[in-house]
């Protein structure tokens, strides 16, 4: 075994965190976050070490530095503010520090002779540092070295030696010749909407009056409604020309009538492909007007669906037949998921010989819509395309546009969903739709927020989608919709609904044991009465207003579940890490019956005095209560209130602190 290149680098650096797969992938944060890093750092013997956190942006050549604080058991911590979008690199640096070691030793000495000798040693260390310094700093250090040797009583010189000003000066001049360095890791900083967003999905073609194909101008007219509900992302299914060959009819009939409009996901016709707009929706200027009006007038970002698949009459099929697989009879292989067949859709062959050109063309689809002002993309079925493609295309696009957000619509196996998030997808759909009991929800959320997944996987909860009408909604009626809304909006900082189907309680399946909607908008135009008395619009607006007003609900990292003696009740809390509000949720999971129980809260964790009452204000239901101690009673009737969203207030001093005063 050969000698090490640097045998005098004695500090061991281990377990730098956070990190994903030994640094293969970056962790994720949002702009404005304070990024905290920890590391194990230690050396042989009893000498003192100095540990730094270094960070920089890709364009920077010099590292910024923060001194790490010892936590005990050789664990160190420091952090820095993430002030800009894009990538940051970070690493730890540590070395055995002679001055810190000497200073620590001096603090323990009591014998005068020992102290006098130690001060001489310290003076020589400071003099050596002065040789490396320049100008006024060098002169100041020589003066401090002389002061350690004499002229003042021993106690005064010892106090001077332990002065923090001297320590800081010595640390800035410390030799790093024998420093140990960790691997360099990365963190990608996304927009705040990556962490906290509220999505509303609608079909533009159903935004017009009954009997007429909707347009982008109709969607512009719908923006006040979407804003009133409190959404800040408006997601549109594909807006491209729809294929005519093998077009599906209403309710997914294999044969379409002349009046059938087809599925927006069967992209492409003689009128154009992925960079074209369906003529009935309007033109490019109409689309740009929608993007501009939504953002400038209502603070709503337009999210566009990207589905990399083609209808049989898509121009790509004619112009680039090599991008598709062909069957022995020469026909193009359509999409299949046996026993299901999708004759109206051709998937790309990512293993074709012309794959570099295919990749570049698909990248250009994103670039086209970015040029039209789109910054958020919902990507359809990314798990059916190669992982290397997504890592490349998202990396290329975000290098130029770090503000981009990509939502992965991959309802697939957990490891596949996690890999897509590691590769660059900003948010992901989840299994929330199929988690309905208290145990299912708590177990799933603890996995999402309490494991390493939380470093890179941002969940986006959807109670419904155009493809998924869960049995819980089908059978539970209006209370079930309210329950799932409250759960999605409070468990996850990112959530969305497919409307107006959701707020208008659309719940009739196409057939028994199906999650498909009857008369689904995927295959036909629908006219919606937004003014219906039974609409959930007011509840939706209220829960979204609560989310905006309480930062605790804009993050997932503080989510905690709490004991309750009734399995039909789910109790959980979130708090603002910046010392702000504490919000407690109790939700009735039973859409049919009134449920009650005793919830038990961790008073120490909440910093509540067990002997002092505290107020709980129901932000959703409007009630105000005075609770005592850890155990308190709740009762919820799903016909009137799906759940409580309590703001907990302590430190009540006078009767005027109570809302009902």
Regions found by a protein language model. Give the residues of each.
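Generic enzyme active-site microenvironment
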Residues: 199, 235, 303-304, 378, ...
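Generic recognition of short, well-ordered alpha-helical segments
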Residues: 214, 247, 388-392, 596-598
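Aromatic-lined carbohydrate-binding surfaces of glycoside hydrolases
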Residues: 238-250, 306-323
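Active-site-adjacent substrate/metal-binding segments within catalytic domains
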Residues: 191-257, 262-283, 348-358
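Conserved beta-strand->loop/alpha-helix structural units within folded catalytic cores of enzymes
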Residues: 223-232, 236-237, 287-306, 369
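Alpha-amylase-like alpha-glycosidases and glucanotransferases acting on alpha-linked glucans and related
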Residues: 261-292, 298-300, 310-538, 542, ...
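Residues immediately flanking
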Residues: 306, 410, 465, 589, ...
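Carbohydrate-interacting/catalytic domains
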Residues: 1-206, 210-232, 241, 294, ...
């Amino acid at each position: 075994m050969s000698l090490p290149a640097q045998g005098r680098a004695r500090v061991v650096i281990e377990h730098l965190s956070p990190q994903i797969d030994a640094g293969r992938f970056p962790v994720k944060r949002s702009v404005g976050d304070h990024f905290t890093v920890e590391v194990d750092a230690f050396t042989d013997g009893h000498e003192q070490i100095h540990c730094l956190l270094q960070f920089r942006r890709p364009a920077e050549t010099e590292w910024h530095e923060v001194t790490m604080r010892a936590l005990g058991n050789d664990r160190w911590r420091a952090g820095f503010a993430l002030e800009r979008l894009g990538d940051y690199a970070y690493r730890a640096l540590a070395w055995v520090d002679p001055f810190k070691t000497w200073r620590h030793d001096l603090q323990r000495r009591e014998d005068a002779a020992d102290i006098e000798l130690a001060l001489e040693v310290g003076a020589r260390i400071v003099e050596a540092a002065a040789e490396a310094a320049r100008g006024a700093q060098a002169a100041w250090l020589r003066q401090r070295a002389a002061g350690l040797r004499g002229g003042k009583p021993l106690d005064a010189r010892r106090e001077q030696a332990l002065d923090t000003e001297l320590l800081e000066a010595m640390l800035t001049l410390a030799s790093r010749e024998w420093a140990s360095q960790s691997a360099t890791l990365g963190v990608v900083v996304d927009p705040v909407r990556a962490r906290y967003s509220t999505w509303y999905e609608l079909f533009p073609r159903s935004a017009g009056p009954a009997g007429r194909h909707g347009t982008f101008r109709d969607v512009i007219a719908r923006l006040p409604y979407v804003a009133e509900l409190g959404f800040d992302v408006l997601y549109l299914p594909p807006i491209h020309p729809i294929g005519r060959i093998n077009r599906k009819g209403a309710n997914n009939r294999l044969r379409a009538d002349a009046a059938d409009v087809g599925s927006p996901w069967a992209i492409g016709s003689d009128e154009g492909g992925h960079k074209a707009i369906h003529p009935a929706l309007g033109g490019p200027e109409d689309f740009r007007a929608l993007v501009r009006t939504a953002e400038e007038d209502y603070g709503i970002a337009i999210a566009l669906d990207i589905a990399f698949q083609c209808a049989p009459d898509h121009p790509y099929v004619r112009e680039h037949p090599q991008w598709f697989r062909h069957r022995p009879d020469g026909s193009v292989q359509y999409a299949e998921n046996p026993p299901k067949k999708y004759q109206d859709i051709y998937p790309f062959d990512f293993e074709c010989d012309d794959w570099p050109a295919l990749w570049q063309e698909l990248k250009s689809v994103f670039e086209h819509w970015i040029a039209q002002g789109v910054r958020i993309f919902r990507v359809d079925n990314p798990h059916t395309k190669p992982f290397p493609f997504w890592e490349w295309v998202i990396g290329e696009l975000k290098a130029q546009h770090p503000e981009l957000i990509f939502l992965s619509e991959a309802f697939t196996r957990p490891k596949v969903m996690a890999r897509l998030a590691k590769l660059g997808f900003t948010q992901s759909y989840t299994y929330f739709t199929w988690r309905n009991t208290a145990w299912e929800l708590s177990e799933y959320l603890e996995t999402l927020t309490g494991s390493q997944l939380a470093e890179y996987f941002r969940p986006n909860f959807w109670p419904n989608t155009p493809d998924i009408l869960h049995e819980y909604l089908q059978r539970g009626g209006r209370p079930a919709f309210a329950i799932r809304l409250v759960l999605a909006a409070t468990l996850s900082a990112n959530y969305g609904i497919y409307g107006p189907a959701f707020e208008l309680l659309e719940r009739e399946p196409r057939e028994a044991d199906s999650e498909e909607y009857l008369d689904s908008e995927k295959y036909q135009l629908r006219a919606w009465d937004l003014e219906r008395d039974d609409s959930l619009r007011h509840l939706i607006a209220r829960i979204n207003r609560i989310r905006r007003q309480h930062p605790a609900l804009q993050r997932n990292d503080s989510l905690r579940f709490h004991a309750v003696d009734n399995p039909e009740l789910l109790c959980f809390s979130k708090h603002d890490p910046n010392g702000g509000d504490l919000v407690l949720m109790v939700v009735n999971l039973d859409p049919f019956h009134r449920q009650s129980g005793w919830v038990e809260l961790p008073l120490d964790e909440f910093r509540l005095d067990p002997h002092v009452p505290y107020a709980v204000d129901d932000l959703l239901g409007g009630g105000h209560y005075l609770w005592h101690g850890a155990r308190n009673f709740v009762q919820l009737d799903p016909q009137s209130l799906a759940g409580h969203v309590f703001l907990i207030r302590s430190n009540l001093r006078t009767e005027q602190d109570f809302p009902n005063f």
